[in-house]
Amino acid sequence: MSAFIVLGAQWGDEGKGKMTDYLAENADVVVRFQGGNNAGHTVVVGEKEYKLHLIPSGILYNDKLNVIGNGVVLDPKALFEEINYLESLGVEITPDRLIISDRAHVIMPYHRVLDGIKERARGNKDIGTTGKGIGPSYTDKMERSGIRVCDLIHKEVFEENLKETLEVKNKIITEVFGEEALDYDEIYNEYLGYAEKLRPFVKDISVIVNKKIKDGKEVLFEGAQGTLLDIDYGTYPYVTSSSTIAGGVCIGAGVGPTAITNAVGIAKAYTTRVGKGPFPTELLDSTGDWVREKGHEFGVTTGRARRCGWLDLVILKTSARVSGLTSFAVTKIDTLAGLDTLKVCTGYRLNGEIIDYVPASLEDLAKCKPIYEEFQGWDDSIANARCYKDLPENAIKYLKKIEDFTETKVSIVSVGPKRDQTMIISEI
């Protein structure tokens, strides 16, 4: 394979960082194609733990080119904080190892301010945004009033764009919401500093990535969030503001669909989500609490406790369909060790009918009652498995159910956070 996608098949937090890190060993290029610093990946290498938000997971290898694509919204302040954090851990960040799309849109201070103001204004109908300005930045992109990286590094263009945009934003901030206006000079000077630091990293990434593919290099596209947070196919409006499915690669990295050879969906052996929105298999009991504590289900970016529930195969089937997944990588199957009985959702009961897809209507999804199939559990020895035959028989049956229901093979299984606790069980 020369170009393949790794993306979340649920509501995010599936272990994409670990899987990308694992698969990046054989890749030449790792590309982040959407989202912003609202995403959080945790990667464990040896005894060290790395928390990534913007920079692709391939940065932990010395011989990979890492790319932030045009589909990403870039907060320069957050980027350089992450670079400083990684360098403090001994990871070298240079323009030879990291490049940034000149077409990526820039998150500005007014995006963060408006994100917080609007979320507070929603009251008990809040969406659960991270408050990092992601949505407002994508809004400006669609309204054609955003500032791109290529604009930021051209002083005169940035000066003109900032004046025009800030005038409008300050009217909204002061006249609509009654908050204090932002200072032009303060923003201008701060971001000019970022521009000079960014300049060496800025490239036309579409040209570079497509040439790598043409030259037969291995290119891995790393998604953030998950399918059920996709702006079109997620549980709208409790979604992110970008396209998290496989199709997002084409617009977020500037490659054609025929360039993609494989798409791997990352799925936990159970289901989690952060924030509000329907969750058919949610466990609101001691079992849910047990899974949360054992699985350390707290957000990397926000620290918020994740809601936990049984594995929902309807969601995985939907993910396989909308992204054309060629296989699944199943993570955290070790977390379920110790439970005598496990449940797996194989359908929803809605208005007297049984369905096997995620309905578009939020109201309909909230009415869906999960239909469960039960499986026998396994013990903690699963964490010591290093190949398929080492897995407990009941775990193998569990994985087989995923394959049969979704009509998509399981190619990778993870039984712990470390690199050596990952096994490839079939061709990716």
Swiss-Prot record:
Function: Plays an important role in the de novo pathway of purine nucleotide biosynthesis. Catalyzes the first committed step in the biosynthesis of AMP from IMP.
UniProt remark on cofactor binding: Binds 1 Mg(2+) ion per subunit.
Cell compartment(s), UniProt: Cytoplasm
Residues annotated for IMP binding in this entry: D13, E14, G15, K16, N38, A39, G40, H41, T130, R144, Q225, T240, R304
Protein family according to the UniProt entry: Belongs to the adenylosuccinate synthetase family.
Binding residues for Mg(2+): D13, G40
Class in the EC hierarchy, top level: ligase
Active site (catalytic residues): D13 (proton acceptor), H41 (proton donor)
Molecular function terms from GO: adenylosuccinate synthase activity; GTP binding; magnesium ion binding
Coarse class of the protein's main subcellular location: cytoplasm
Entry GO CC: cytoplasm
Protein name (Swiss-Prot/TrEMBL): Adenylosuccinate synthetase
UniProt binding sites for substrate: V300, T301, T302, G303, R304, A305, R306
Sites where the protein binds GTP: 12-18, 40-42, 306, 332-334, 414-416
Assembly notes: Homodimer.
Keywords, sorted A to Z: Cytoplasm, GTP-binding, Ligase, Magnesium, Metal-binding, Nucleotide-binding, Purine biosynthesis
One biological process term in Gene Ontology: IMP metabolic process
EC number(s) from the headed UniProt entry: 6.3.4.4
NCBIfam families: PRK01117.1, purA
UniProt superkingdom: Bacteria
Catalysed conversion reaction: IMP + L-aspartate + GTP = N(6)-(1,2-dicarboxyethyl)-AMP + GDP + phosphate + 2 H(+)
Pathway(s) annotated for this protein in UniProt: Purine metabolism; AMP biosynthesis via de novo pathway; AMP from IMP: step 1/2
